[in-house]
């Protein structure tokens, strides 16, 4: 081989070697540089100062990840979130990477959500860490999990301690018959026969804050199977469902009612000291504390039918990830991080700096800590037995049920025909939204 060819081969070898070394060096440098991920997180009640310290901690532990927390109005949140997720599928309209969803929404929202990867949390771990209602509520028809709860909440009895003491009760009775007897004893009427002190706020919809939640609880108590397995049909006119509905409206229709349509909103009347017992969640307790410090009140488990298995009604929120997120895996890692005991405690502590208590812990392992707080004690007792209904179209279904309650309780309509009419409307909607 002549010298010229040797020189060319030598140069080629040097060039090839340089390219190989450069490629290796670039690969090493790129692998050592953290990936840049920007995520948007939609919340609606926890203020920036409550959530931001946890976001800062996650960002410090995961260089390159930037999370923006955006507070949304709770009013119309369901339709706002759904519209954004829907538009993000077909356009460049931005949707949140991470968002809060109600425990009843999964059938409607599932098509726009990213399932929880087993690499982040397995189904087995999930079922051990969270209450049975969370497993049922956040699992889609495809068997995949679509949200992690950062809280647990549900209906409780909020009671005026002074009014109960005056009538000889320390706490509301836990069996249904004794509870109703107490409600009757605690109801007072004026000379014209009208209620001036309600023993129990129940039976209407326009002036009862949680009317549909109470009705759903009655369905559970009466073992009414109101929702089909695929979540596309509601059965509101079965004998058990009708009996539960009629029981609810009977509280304002019977001879000696404990409540009436002419009374103010139950929360307002309770704050005025004129309601002995009402149904509400932990967030209603916070509202009462904000409105007044003059009412000494307690929170008790729901009364139940003693011959049935224990069951209580859950209404709470989970945290999910959008299918169109820029990085679904990183988003889910952050959600799991928020759900860890250390972070839940810190969230609670941050919130408790500005209000009486933080979000009730969602993890089964933290139940004893819930039981230590007088405002969450009842939740700690009921949480293992809570259930709900995955209706999907929560706002629509609840509005139709409120209309039915008003039609029957206040306008004297037939419950059967009224419920048949709204059932047809609801099922037409669910057949599209929950498919």
Feature locations, PLM:
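Extracytoplasmic "Venus flytrap"/periplasmic binding protein-like
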Residues: 57, 64-133, 137, 165-174, ...
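C-terminal capping/gating helix-and-loop segments adjacent to ligand/active sites or protein-protein/ligand interfaces
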Residues: 230, 354-360, 374-426, 430
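A structural signal for short loop-to-beta-strand junctions that line the ligand-binding cleft
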Residues: 86-91, 95-97, 123-164, 197, ...
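Glycine-centered hinge/linker elements that transmit conformational signals in sensory
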Residues: 182-187, 229-260, 291, 302
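Short, well-ordered beta-strand elements
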Residues: 35-46, 65-70, 97-98, 146
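Hinge/lid segment of periplasmic solute-binding proteins
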Residues: 101-154, 180, 195-196, 211-214, ...
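Short, solvent-exposed loop/beta-turn-alpha elements that line the ligand-binding surface or hinge
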Residues: 117-130, 198-209, 222-243, 290-292, ...
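Extracytoplasmic/periplasmic solute-binding protein
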Residues: 142-150, 155, 180-233, 275
């Amino acid at each position: 081989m002549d010298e010229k060819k040797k020189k060319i081969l030598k140069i080629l070898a040097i060039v090839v070697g340089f390219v190989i070394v450069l490629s290796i060096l670039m690969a090493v440098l790129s692998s050592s540089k953290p990936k840049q991920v920007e995520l948007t997180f939609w919340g609606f009640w926890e203020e920036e100062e409550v959530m931001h310290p946890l976001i800062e901690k996650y960002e410090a532990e995961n260089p390159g990840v930037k999370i923006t927390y955006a507070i949304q109005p709770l009013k119309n949140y369901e339709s706002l979130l759904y519209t954004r997720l829907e538009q993000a599928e077909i356009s460049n309209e931005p949707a949140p990477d991470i968002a809060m969803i109600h425990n009843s929404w999964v059938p409607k929202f599932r098509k726009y959500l990213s399932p929880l990867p087993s690499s982040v949390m397995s189904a087995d771990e999930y079922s051990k860490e969270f209450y049975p209602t969370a497993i049922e509520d956040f699992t889609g028809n495809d068997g995949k999990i679509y949200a992690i709860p950062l809280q647990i909440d549900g209906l409780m009895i909020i009671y005026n301690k002074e009014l109960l003491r005056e009538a000889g009760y320390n706490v509301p009775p836990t069996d249904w018959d004794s509870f109703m007897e107490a409600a009757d004893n605690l109801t007072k009427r004026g000379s014209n026969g009208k209620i001036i002190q309600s023993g129990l706020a129940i039976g209407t919809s326009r002036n009862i804050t949680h009317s549909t939640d109470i009705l759903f609880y009655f369905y559970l108590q009466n073992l009414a199977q109101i929702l089909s397995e695929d979540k596309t049909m509601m059965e509101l006119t079965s004998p058990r469902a009708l009996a539960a509905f009629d029981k609810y409206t009977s509280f304002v229709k019977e001879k000696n009612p404990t409540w009436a349509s002419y009374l103010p909103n139950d929360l307002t009347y309770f704050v005025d000291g004129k309601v002995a017992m009402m149904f509400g969640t932990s967030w209603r307790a916070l509202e009462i504390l904000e409105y007044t410090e003059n009412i000494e009140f307690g929170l008790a488990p729901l009364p139940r039918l003693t011959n049935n298995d224990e069951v209580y009604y859950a209404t709470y929120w989970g945290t999910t990830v959008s299918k169109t997120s820029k990085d679904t895996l990183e988003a889910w890692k952050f959600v799991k991080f928020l759900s860890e005991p250390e972070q839940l405690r810190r969230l609670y502590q941050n919130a408790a700096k500005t209000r009486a208590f933080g979000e009730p812990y969602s993890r089964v392992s933290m139940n004893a800590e819930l039981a230590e707080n007088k405002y969450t004690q009842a939740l700690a007792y009921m949480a293992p037995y809570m259930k709900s209904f995955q209706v999907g179209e929560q706002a629509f279904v609840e509005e139709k049920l409120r209309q039915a309650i008003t039609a029957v309780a206040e306008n004297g309509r037939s419950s059967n025909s009224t419920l048949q009419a709204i059932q047809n409307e609801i099922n037409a909607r669910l057949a599209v939204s929950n498919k």
